[in-house]
């Protein structure tokens, strides 16, 4: 399970180091293979899955009938735009320029461990995310009983 926040540096070739704390987990879960795709819900963010978890997500998304525009858009953003990546000998992955450009990732990024996946945020989008607050209305009835 992935959790925590890590400041990431992206080099001129678009490579970033996966934090050492996660490398063994990624190696065991998916033989050093990850899948990168767009976060369909929030701008400035990419999702990064271990390949084994990605296969479950991909199959679930593609099992939905694409007769609705929202389903097609979800399939396009998640599956159609997915990039398969492999950790190199130094624990780095290369983020495609198309993905970096689309979400505004340049030299600095933030990696969030989100349980079954990572979120890779541009530094600016992450700063805006952290500055947002939640109200009781945002939580809704199902979350009001959380004990945080």
UniProtKB/Swiss-Prot annotation:
Origin superkingdom: Bacteria
Signal peptide: none
Keywords: Cytoplasm, DNA-binding, Repeat, Transcription, Transcription regulation
Gene Ontology BP annotations: negative regulation of DNA-templated transcription initiation
Pfam families assigned: MraZ (PF02381)
SUPFAM superfamilies: AbrB/MazE/MraZ-like
GO molecular function annotations of the record: DNA-binding transcription factor activity; transcription cis-regulatory region binding
Cellular compartment(s): Cytoplasm, Nucleoid
Residue ranges annotated for the SpoVT-AbrB domain, each copy included: 5-53, 82-125
A single Gene Ontology CC term: cytoplasm
Family statement drawn from the similarity comment of this UniProt entry: Belongs to the MraZ family.
Quaternary structure annotation from Swiss-Prot or TrEMBL: Forms oligomers.
Name under which the protein is recorded: Transcriptional regulator MraZ
The encoding gene: mraZ
């Amino acid at each position: 399970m992935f959790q925590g926040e890590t400041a990431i540096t992206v080099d001129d070739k678009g490579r970033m180091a996966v934090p050492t704390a996660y490398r063994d987990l990624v190696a065991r879960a998916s033989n050093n293979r990850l899948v990168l795709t767009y976060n369909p819900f929030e701008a400035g963010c990419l999702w990064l899955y271990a390949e084994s978890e990605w296969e479950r997500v991909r199959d679930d998304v593609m099992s939905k009938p694409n007769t609705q525009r929202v389903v097609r858009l979800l399939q396009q953003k998640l599956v159609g735009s997915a990039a398969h990546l492999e950790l190199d000998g130094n624990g780095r992955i290369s983020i495609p320029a198309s993905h970096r450009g689309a979400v505004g990732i340049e030299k600095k990024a933030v990696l969030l461990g989100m349980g079954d996946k990572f979120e890779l945020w541009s530094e600016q989008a992450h700063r805006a995310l952290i500055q947002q607050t939640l109200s009781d209305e945002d939580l809704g009835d199902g979350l009001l009983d959380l004990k945080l």
